[in-house]
Amino acid sequence: DIQLTYHRRHTTTTKVGNLEIGSEHPVRVQTMANTSTNDIDGSVAQANRCFAAGAELLRYTTQGMREVESLAQIRKAVQEFSSSGVTPLVADVHFQSDVADAAAKVVEKVRINPGNYIDPARKFKQIDYTDEEYQAELERLRQRFVLLLHICKEHKTALRIGVNHGSLSDRIMSRYGDTPEGMVESCMEFLRVAVAEDFKDIVLSIKASNTRVMVTTVRLLVWQMQEEKS
């Protein structure tokens, strides 16, 4: 028999509604809707099909406040369909931190992208920061992210920190380059704030189209988390 040396890393348990995620639980099945979030009837019908087929979480693109309002209606209808009550919805938010705040009051989980949560849309510009200026940017990040964490605590909403290789901020790119180290630091900036605020209902993801880059980055992230005991 082939003996595999890989094993699941021990983690805390993240609660997404009534669903538990972590090393002590099965790997969960999540999918993403391809309907317009504002097509409420179509989105509800697709959600019901997804959950009936075995999906455990369903993610919706959430571009603005109109989509947040639509998500609230979708969630209400989906919960009425569910016999178990375990049908968590996820809002996928980019560029607008206030939309993430609003979505956290409506659904069970919110995904944010560190590359555009508070930093402006990427312009592929090299920006030279002094150490003091860089720390000031990190403090600005902390102050804004803490507001979202407090909302999530109040509403028992989970968070996903979802880093994309293709959307690292100009700030990260200027200091770390287009590297696994930059992706890891983009994630860790937010995770450090969550740890300091004792917020544990959190999921991490790092994606790259190049699988070697992605595997290297995930391993580096695990090493960095172990170093910082986070």
Task: Name what the model sees in each region.
Residues M65-A91, E139-K156, E185, E189, ...:
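Alpha-helix-loop-beta-strand connector modules within alpha/beta enzyme cores
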Residues S84-F124, D131-L148:
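Hydrophobic or amphipathic alpha-helical targeting/insertion segments
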Residues N34, A52-V78, P114-A136, I202-T211:
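Glycine-rich, proline-tolerant flexible connector loops at the mouths of alpha/beta enzymes
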Residues D1-M32, V146-H155:
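N-terminal amphipathic alpha-helix/helix-capping segment at the start of soluble metabolic enzymes
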Residues T13, G17, I40-C50, A100, ...:
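Structured alpha-helical segments in the cores of large, soluble enzyme domains
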Residues V27-A33, L58-Y60, T87-V93, V110-I112, ...:
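Hydrophobic faces of well-ordered beta-strands that scaffold small-molecule active sites
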Residues D128-F145, I172-S230:
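Catalytic alpha/beta core domains of metabolic enzymes, predominantly
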Residues H7, V16, S23-G42, T61, ...:
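Active-site mouth loops of central-metabolism enzymes
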